[in-house]
């Protein structure tokens, strides 16, 4: 049989080359001998097995070559009918595997007739044809198995590629959704922070505006208080001046002209008359001053309470109106007091100027 080589790859980086060794049959009277040329192979790199179901001998082997290549062979030989299976043995020498298959009945070829030799040759030829057929069938099956393995491997690779693609798409989708959620959460946080900042700024502006309004109210109340105190002081000064002038007029001695000369004699009657004449005006002024004092005290207490409410931001519009009314009432009372004081002073001046003239006329010397 001629040797034939064929390269096959498994896809894992290792390539196999199929080696078809040369074989030769020898028919001897005691046994049938099969010689197989396995040049390059060692005894440890081959294996011989007998298949009972098909009554065949399978010889396999493989050896490494260079560049990740391997050489292998798988040969099947049919065991002849007239053979003792239990006594089959082999030997390996000079790169030749020799398989000896002893016969059940020893035949003497030299004494066989021509027909027997022809039949033996025909049987040997038929055996070789059967062996060839079985070998081709075995190779065809092996090729089909190899193709099935390749197809299975290809399908497995396609399946793995599809799974990887689906996993990558799912991962990309998940990452996109995660980024979207993070962006939405970040936008919400920024919006909430912006809203909170705006609320804080609005609250601060409101606080500043309320504080400014409170300061203005306090300044107005302080100005009103200072104005009222100034007016009260002015009225008190006028009252003191009027009282001192009245006392001077009452205690001033009256000069009486007589024959012996003028004698200064006080006239309590005129003083009492003056006092009785202006008693009503004094009572009006005194009543106005008492009312004014009470109003000032009440206003001070009320002002303290209102100031306290302003500090606590509790003042109402009604209390603001009440404050304005109190200020107006105070101004009216001050004006009334000033008018009464002025009237009192004018009356005192006219009465004091008329009293000496009457005295001089009544005490004119004879």
Curated annotation (Swiss-Prot):
B- repeats lie at residues 163-176, 178-191, 193-205. Residues 129-220 are annotated as: 6 X 5 AA repeats A of L-E-E-[SKR]-[ERK]. It is found in: Cell membrane. Expressed in leaves, stems, and inflorescence, exclusively in phloem-associated cells (e.g. sieve elements). It comes from the Eukaryota. Keywords: Cell membrane, Membrane, Plant defense, Repeat, Transmembrane, Transmembrane helix. This is Protein RESTRICTED TEV MOVEMENT 2. It comes from Arabidopsis thaliana (Mouse-ear cress). The gene is RTM2.
